[in-house]
Amino acid sequence: MQDLISQISSASTLAELENIKVSVLGKKGILTLEFAKLKDLQGEEKKEFANGLNKTRDEFNEAYQVKLKELEEKALNEKMKQDVQDFSFFDETSNAGALHPIMQTMDKIIEYFTALNFSIEKGPLIEDDFHNFEALNLPQNHPARDMQDTFYFEDKTLLRSQTSPVQIRTMLSQKPPIRMIAPGAVFRRDFDITHTPMFHQVEGLVVEEGDKINFANLKDMLENFLKYMFGDVKVRFRPSFFPFTEPSAEVDISCVFCKGCGCRVCKHTGWLEVLGCGVVDPNVYKFVGYKNVSGYAFGLGVERFAMLLHKIPDLRSMFEGDLRLLEQFR
């Protein structure tokens, strides 16, 4: 047995160790041939001989397993030394991923408002008539309710056409003061150079008790926001109409392409429309059970902002997955 143990100890590779095992326990191995002799023995002699062989086999297997573990660890360490990789090495030929320009724009918008302590609120993509229309003061005959503008399901639910329903859900679940934005996807039946059936909006809402909030607060906040997004641009507010705000306004900035001089993009007006806003209509407060409060709301299209920030002429190109375009925004 000592000779077998010394053979195991002298093995320097896994192959050598395996050859020793075969020479001992293989079909023609030393111990295998010894076990074959048991058939010629009888009684006590057979029992003693078998016990001795079993003990020898167990000791051999134990020594073999210890040596096997040692040689496996040695082989692994040698392989790791040969396969050393520098994980700090940057391969300039690899195609590193990057955020889509729409997501880059969305992140920049969210960054601004979260710095002003606006919360980020979410809502379902499939909405009901109450949250998407009725509670927002959109009457039954409003054009937005028409099937040519909104995606309806058979059970009269719909794909939300704006993120404004999130404002309603937030007011129904929270009490003033509220400072929130609702970023997310919305859906409308429209597809051309400046519209897609699915696009992204960020809508904001500020509500406080009493009459603390007015249009001047809204105007100041949006002017600062637009200068943060587009740099030193001029901002103007034009009277408009939205069912859920009164008074309402559309907001323009001086054209980022021609610096307000007039070009094809701004239709030679020098101005580009970027968002809508207004003081929340009192009828909206009635639907959510608010009393003696004041507030303002605003909404913008993220794709519109991305087009202006990155000077992308066709909105549809941002949804085609063309790497030649997307690689420019790494």
From Swiss-Prot:
Subcellular location: Cytoplasm
Short name of any one Pfam family annotated for the protein: Phe_tRNA-synt_N
GO biological process: phenylalanyl-tRNA aminoacylation
Top-level class of the enzyme under EC nomenclature: ligase
CDD domains (UniProt xref): PheRS_alpha_core (cd00496)
Obligatory cofactor(s): Mg(2+)
Keyword terms: Aminoacyl-tRNA synthetase, ATP-binding, Cytoplasm, Ligase, Magnesium, Metal-binding, Nucleotide-binding, Protein biosynthesis
Signal sequence bounds: none
Cofactor, free-text remark: Binds 2 magnesium ions per tetramer.
Entry GO MF terms: ATP binding; magnesium ion binding; phenylalanine-tRNA ligase activity; tRNA binding
Enzyme Commission identifier(s): 6.1.1.20
The reaction(s) this protein catalyses: tRNA(Phe) + L-phenylalanine + ATP = L-phenylalanyl-tRNA(Phe) + AMP + diphosphate + H(+)
Main subcellular location of this protein, as a coarse class: cytoplasm
Residues that coordinate or bind Mg(2+): E246
GO CC annotation terms, alphabetical: cytoplasm
Oligomeric form and interacting partners: Tetramer of two alpha and two beta subunits.
Protein family membership: Belongs to the class-II aminoacyl-tRNA synthetase family. Phe-tRNA synthetase alpha subunit type 1 subfamily.
Protein name: Phenylalanine--tRNA ligase alpha subunit
Originating organism: Campylobacter lari (strain RM2100 / D67 / ATCC BAA-1060)
